UniProtKB/Swiss-Prot annotation:
Protein name: Uncharacterized protein AF_1616
Pfam families, alphabetized: DUF5395
Taxonomic source organism: Archaeoglobus fulgidus (strain ATCC 49558 / DSM 4304 / JCM 9628 / NBRC 100126 / VC-16)
Signal sequence, start to end: 1-15
Alphabetical keyword list: Signal
Domain of life: Archaea
Length: 80
């Protein structure tokens, strides 16, 4: 299994990015679908685990009472 790390941030849309790939979506479901497409375009195959660490600086001030790890995500794709 390949494991990749991404930064996750939210502005007008959700954005997951690393040095190689950028994916965007208006919802987390759309982000996941677009990330899967970008992984396929980049040539990834098999099982790929994505860890998304949330960029806490993009969270609104009023939400900073929450711990940043609440917004971290892990997604696994099985790419053929």
């Amino acid at each position: 299994m390949v494991k990749l790390s991404f930064t996750l941030r939210f502005g007008d849309v959700w954005v997951a990015e690393n040095e190689e790939i950028v994916a965007k979506g208006h919802s987390l479901d759309e982000l996941d679908r677009n990330l899967e497409l970008e992984l396929r375009k980049a040539g990834y195959k098999g099982r790929v685990e994505i860890f998304m660490k949330f960029d806490y600086s993009t969270i609104p001030e009023w939400m900073r009472q929450f711990h940043p790890h609440y917004f971290n995500r892990t997604v696994v794709f099985d790419l053929d």
